[in-house]
Amino acid sequence: MTAEEYDDAVTMAIERRRRTIEAEWNELGTVVLIGAGHPIPIPGRADRVYPFLAHSEYFYLTDHQRPGAVLAYDPQEGWSEFVPAISADERLWSGALSDEAGTPASELGPWLERRRGRRVAQLGAPIPNAPSDVAVAAELRTQMDRVRRRKDDIELARMRLAADATCAGFAAAVPFIAPGVSERALQIEIEAGFFRHGADTVAYDSIIASGPNAAVLHHLPTQRLLGAGELVLIDAGAEYRGYDCDVTRTYPVSGDFSAEQAAVYALVLRVQRAAIERCRAGVEYRDIHLAAALDVAQGLVDAGFLRGNAGDLVEQGASALFFPHGIGHMVGLGVRDAGGYLPGRSRSEAPALRFLRIDLPLEPGHVVTIEPGIYFPPHVLEDPEIRRQHRDTVVWKSVDKLRGFGGIRIEDNVLIRDGGNEVLTRGIPKE
């Protein structure tokens, strides 16, 4: 496909997305404003700002990174895009950060004034001095989330390219894993691999966690040196044209797992493979998570870390001490993509469900992460109240032997298809 053909395909995809959204929104008859957002200043850093990323709801319907822009929809007249002019000073210091095709942003006020008395709702980033019906906006967002969860061909093509860059980054970093190498050095290698293979940026702050740091779910890399016999957990991904990849692998620093590490790794891998197999259209994601929690609980019983019935251990929260998060989340336009809860469903406070990020039936076109993990976090397992509460379900003598173990997580991105699924990140070895 030539560059011109690709641009035409993107244009057609945007038109299809807008038509699909129109069919949802027209019933409400609401004027909709979708803000791209503005650059965010870095506190105390003079005129520096964080790298700009347009709000995902705006980007989805424009494919533009335009600071300060607003996409407007009037069911009676269609779509309009209002774009700020780029000043001479901005061109001097930063160049043309975006194209200016569209209606001048100064015309948004008069455009709204001509629609005075009609209901207006805002999506995307907040638009100063513009009205918004909050309740209607929530309904519009629910409709948009439902559409956005199903990835079209352009989105999937970008996600595959992000996955390719991610695969290249892991391939570049893994040979450097050795005692005496710092977490930061591994971050440099993996992210350089992303960029060398076409990534625009990283999908999120890379997690490089060695030794006990691997028990911290979102540990940021430091100058800590990897120790012989330890584990190192790498959770990182590339972004391409707004679309993200999110992968985790866990490696033995010295090249081979110890017996204890191998047993826990085999359990996590077994749980992940079973969860991926369950990822099919029509299956409730909550059920995939709960089945994984049961598998973890039974595996910890078999390994001698827990005692009792697996179902009871999940319900009582004993297994959540070691598997504290959900099985995954939506991924795509952003590392955590469009809303994962159906209307009328809310988060549960049950120990095994507190951090569940998706509660809906899977559909073809959804892309989710599947990322079970088992951790031995000292701040949890050394808490006297937790030890007292779970004295009958946790075999503390066995658990205490794994102080400093850290944790193991394995994560892949799974596309739901008619009749099955496809693992987009299968090119990154995990055994």
Give names to the regions the model predicted.
Residues 1-431:
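Active-site neighborhoods and metal-handling regions in enzymes and metal-associated proteins
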